[in-house]
Swiss-Prot record:
It comes from Rhizobium rhizogenes (strain K84 / ATCC BAA-868). Belongs to the YqgF nuclease family. PANTHER family: POLYNUCLEOTIDYL TRANSFERASE, RIBONUCLEASE H-LIKE SUPERFAMILY PROTEIN (PTHR33317:SF4). GO terms for cellular component: cytosol. Gene3D superfamilies: YqgF/RNase H-like domain. It comes from the Bacteria. The keyword Lyase does not apply. This is Putative pre-16S rRNA nuclease. It is found in: Cytoplasm.
């Protein structure tokens, strides 16, 4: 397993491969999945955290079932750009995954993703109880969508041009 930049991931991905987005929390792991065209991120049910070994098994079973080619994981930077304990915990999680999978990880700045997810859920008039259940996966979706938008801006098509 390696960590890549989004630019390196763009070069490595094959057409039609999906990407998973992760929002790592202390109690849950928010999940999102791209479509095969890598244009849209869709929230998926959260993984309830237990212990790292079980969390990794659940995540990798999801990745195998969904044919995930890479993970984009939110990096919870402070608003001033500095790092703190949550960034260290996220990097430790990714390092620990190195023993479990060859799938690459891309770190993605997640500042304000939870705020944006909360706002979107409020605009959809989702109840407080349902928001609490869905916020982490909604945040993972915002994280993944940012990465998908960057991949698109890099000009790497998800599918080859069939007219050439």
């Amino acid at each position: 397993m390696t960590t890549l930049t989004i630019e390196d991931l763009a070069v490595m991905l094959l057409p039609g491969q999906a990407i998973a987005g992760l929002d790592l929390g202390t109690k849950t792991i928010g999940l999102a999945m791209s479509d095969l065209g890598r244009r849209f991120a869709t929230p998926r049910p959260v993984i309830k955290r237990v212990k790292f070994t079980q969390d990794a098994q659940t995540l990798l079973a999801f990745a195998e079932k969904e044919k995930v080619a890479a993970f984009v994981i939110g990096l919870p930077m402070n608003m001033d750009g500095s790092t703190g304990p949550r960034v260290q915990a996220t990097r430790a999680f990714v390092r620990s995954m190195a023993d479990k999978t060859a799938l690459p990880f891309v770190y993605w700045d997640e500042r304000l993703s939870t705020v944006a997810a909360e706002r979107a859920l409020l605009e959809m008039d989702v109840s407080r109880a349902k928001r609490a259940e869905r916020i982490d996966s909604a945040a993972a979706s915002f994280i993944l969508q940012g990465a998908l938008d960057r991949l698109s801006a890099l000009g790497r098509p998800a599918f080859p041009d069939l007219d050439s």
